[in-house]
Amino acid sequence: INLYNRRQDSELKAWIDSEIQVLFGMQKNSGIIEGWHGDGNFARTALMYGLWKTQGAHLEPWQPTVKIGAISTKDKRYFVITAEDNWEGQLMFDQKRHKTILNLPVDYPRINQFPEWFTLDQDAIYSIESNQKQLNGLYEGKDLKLGIKISLSANEQCIIMVKKPRI
């Protein structure tokens, strides 16, 4: 997953998606894998996989009936949010954790890191297009850092496209 974060390759992507299913298949209903410290490695890998598949974004408040997924293209990120029940909350984007938490000048590869996928530049302008028309427009990174308010009815889907700024 760390390698894929830096070098997107379709064969590597397919292998990761295949192998995570093997890992998930090992998990018992209790959540335990093998009952030793290696379970922590599994949990870390599962978190890394989840961060990749959401491009680092998350929803607040969390609800088990609300799902988020994301994909990236060369200059865009697509976020899809679905809710089984009515839900109101915010889509929160990841931050440049290497800078804001670890005080590192660059996001260099490190053992046990959680890769950064889509992070905001607070001084940039982002373009958003969505099937929820009220979300369409230009946003400053510092405003997006606070989240995007979303309201979903039961079984509704929200699609949001965020275009990277031109630098």
Give the label of every model feature segment.
Residues 1-166:
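Glycan-recognition and catalytic cores of secretory/periplasmic carbohydrate-active enzymes
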